[in-house]
Amino acid sequence: MKCPKCNSTQSKVVDSRHADELNAIRRRRECENCGTRFTTFEHIEVSQLIVVKKDGTREQFSREKILNGLVRSCEKRPVRYQQLEDITNKVEWQLRDEGHTEVSSRDIGEHVMNLLMHVDQVSYVRFASVYKEFKDVDQLLASMQGILSENKRSDA
C-alpha cells in the first residue's frame, strides 16, 4: 500500500476489523517512512455478471436496479430497508454461485420474486405485476390465487 502523503510502500497495519456494512476488512495503517496514518479496505474481487435483457441487449449487472425495484414495490408496506438489502444480496450471490457470466433478466426477476414472497405478499404482487407485465386484472388475480394456494399448502 502506498502512503497517500509520501508514496512510500513501507507501512504496517496497526488495527484491523471487519466492516460489516461493506463486506470488507478495514485496516488502519501507519507509514514507516513519514508516520502518516491512513485507512484501507480489503474487498473480495468478484467477476462481473452480464444481464441479457428481454430484447437481447446486454448490460452490466446492477444491484441498485434490483434494490430500487424492491423499494418501489414495498412503498408504504411494513418492510425494513435491511430486508430489501438482504434480498438483493441473496439474489446477487445466488446468481454468482450458479457460475454463469451471463444471466437473463427473467432469471433475476424469478430469484427476487421467490425471496420477496416470503417477506411481504402484497409487495410480491406489486413486483410481479411489473415484472410479469400483467395485461389485465385476470392475470393479477391468477397470481394472487397462486399465493393463496401456497399459503394453504404451508398452513396444512
From Swiss-Prot:
Keywords: ATP-binding, DNA-binding, Metal-binding, Nucleotide-binding, Repressor, Transcription, Transcription regulation, Zinc, Zinc-finger. InterPro entries: ATP-cone_dom, NrdR-like_N, RNR_NrdR-like. It comes from the Bacteria. One of its GO terms (biological process) is negative regulation of DNA-templated transcription. HAMAP family: NrdR (MF_00440). Belongs to the NrdR family. This is Transcriptional repressor NrdR. It comes from Staphylococcus aureus (strain NCTC 8325 / PS 47).
